[in-house]
Design a protein with these regions (language model features):
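Bacterial N-terminal signal peptides that target proteins for export
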Residues: 1-9
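Bacterial N-terminal signal peptides
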Residues: 8-18
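Boundary/entry segment of secreted carbohydrate-active catalytic domains
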Residues: 26-59
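Substrate-binding cleft and catalytic face of glycoside hydrolase catalytic domains
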Residues: 49-226
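Noncatalytic carbohydrate-binding groove/subsite architecture in carbohydrate-active enzymes
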Residues: 164-294, 303
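Aromatic/acidic polysaccharide-binding cleft in carbohydrate-active enzymes
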Residues: 268-341, 355-360, 369
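Carbohydrate-binding surface patches
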Residues: 357-402
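C-terminal beta-strand-rich structural cap/linker in extracellular carbohydrate-active enzymes
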Residues: 409-444
Length: 444
């Protein structure tokens, strides 16, 4: 009976997710800075939260499972792209997953056979795949991410690419050359890097190792070093969002490069969801996850990230797996969903960012079209009281992380007073996420 009920519930959820979202308000489209991975799984909810971009994985082994003559386009993939585009969400594709027949290595992550042949050689199987997939989606998909987390070494848990750094550079190079031939407007992203795998295993930064390979290639400079956008994945610790992006930008500059940086995955999965009892080991609650969503987006903007995406929009696994979604598999919302709504409502139409890091708090000021948004939170286990000058000629409202509005008035000297709640910290004093943020919005 329980299994029958679960099947019915999942079927109903899938039917709901297949419904077309509300029509796009052409005068007020979603802000493309703010995305959510796999929001196509629940397009109605994505439209409601005003998700601006989506990431969709296209597995090579799904297109050509058995041989090079196959080409299978899943019909649901085409529908997802159309629905997202109609709702104002840009779809960004991630290419990965070597078919077993196309590699001498492990299926899924092996180095494609013929990778070092010229890109126009029929024996270069990866080039043939990229040429066809980019051509098929010309006009629908412009941004292409080349593989996922290549910095996880083959011997480490979670490895997704079995090649060397040199092999990944060649994978990137071939994809760049072929994609630009098919669609000159194609934008090639470096596969998202985790940062921590190099740090934990005491390896030099993967980005540095990759660029060391690139600078030896005499053709690289003329081709933008074969990638247009750098991609990072950052989880759990709020403050590392700013710090890690800054580290990667510094490395790029050391090699004379200035690339846009996207934060394609960020989140802090909670460990206290009763529907997902086997939660992560890092002590972040659902309340803390909501704080993280606001803080991570604010810090990413402060450090100059061009786009940010939450991983992920909705869970696609039952209880017992890490609960990253803003929504559970049954479409019920975690508190983080309303925090995300606050971001897509009051962090948009950005013109300028100012950032203040103090020993006990953060303050990020977003100057927007027609408004000023200030985001503040405590860094440590003590509450902090702030006095912030009111912006002349504006009306103010202050929001908690769930979007609830509270009364706020400036004092006689024209200052607002905010008390920032203490950050939740463990027994060792480690504060993974800052205290509950306040979002002060002044409108002209």
């Amino acid at each position: 009976m329980k299994q029958t009920f679960l099947r019915l519930a999942l079927t109903f959820a899938l039917l709901l997710s297949a419904l077309p979202p509300a029509p796009l308000d052409a005068a007020n489209p979603p802000d493309p800075r703010f995305g959510a991975v796999e929001s196509y799984m629940a397009p109605d909810l994505a439209a409601d939260l005003r998700v601006g971009w989506d990431r969709m994985i296209i597995h090579w082994y799904t297109r050509q499972p058995d041989n090079a003559d196959q080409w299978i386009t899943p019909p649901e993939e085409t529908d997802r792209i159309k629905i997202a585009t109609a709702a104002g969400r840009e779809v960004v594709a991630l290419l990965m997953g070597t078919p077993a027949w196309a590699t001498d290595g492990p299926g899924g992550g092996g180095v494609p056979r013929g990778l070092y042949l010229p890109a126009n050689d029929p024996g270069n199987l990866w080039a043939r795949f990229v040429r066809r997939i980019v051509g098929e989606n010309k006009g629908a998909i412009t941004h292409w991410i080349i593989w996922n987390e290549p910095d996880i070494a083959l011997e480490d848990y979670g490895a997704q690419y079995a090649g060397t750094v040199e092999d990944y550079y060649q994978l990137l190079k071939v994809a760049y050359v072929v994609a630009k031939e098919v669609n000159p407007n194609a934008v090639i992203h470096l596969g998202g890097l985790t940062y921590w795998h190099d740090l934990v295993y005491n390896r030099p930064s993967y980005l540095r190792r990759l660029l060391d390979v690139a600078v030896k290639d005499k053709t690289a400079k003329a081709h933008n070093y074969y990638f247009d956008i750098f991609t990072a994945h950052i989880y759990f610790r709020t403050e590392t969002v700013f710090n890690i992006v800054a580290i990667y930008r510094k490395i790029l500059r050391e090699y004379g490069l200035s690339k846009p940086i996207w934060l394609n995955e960020t989140n802090a999965a909670p460990n206290d969801d009763p529907q997902y009892p086997a939660g992560p080991l890092i002590p972040v609650t659902m309340d803390g996850q909501a704080s993280f969503i606001i803080q991570a987006n604010a810090l990413a903007l402060a450090v100059g990230a061009e786009r940010i995406a939450v991983y992920k929009f909705i869970d696609d696994t039952p209880s017992g797996y890490e609960p990253y979604g803003l929504f559970r598999v049954d479409h019920s919302a975690r508190p983080a969903a309303e925090a995300y709504r606050l971001v897509t409502s009051h962090f948009t139409n950005l013109k300028r960012v100012m950032y203040s890091q103090q020993p006990n708090y953060y303050l990020v000021t977003l100057t927007r079209r027609g408004a000023v948004t200030r985001v503040a939170w405590a860094r440590a286990g003590q509450e902090v009281t702030l006095r912030l000058p009111a912006t002349p000629g504006t009306k103010a409202a202050v929001y908690d992380k769930f979007g609830k509005t509270y009364p706020l008035a400036a004092d006689r000297k024209g200052f607002y007073s905010l008390t920032l709640p203490a950050a939740p910290c463990d027994k060792s004093g480690e504060c993974y996420v800052g205290g509950s943020p306040w979002v002060l919005v002044e409108t002209y």
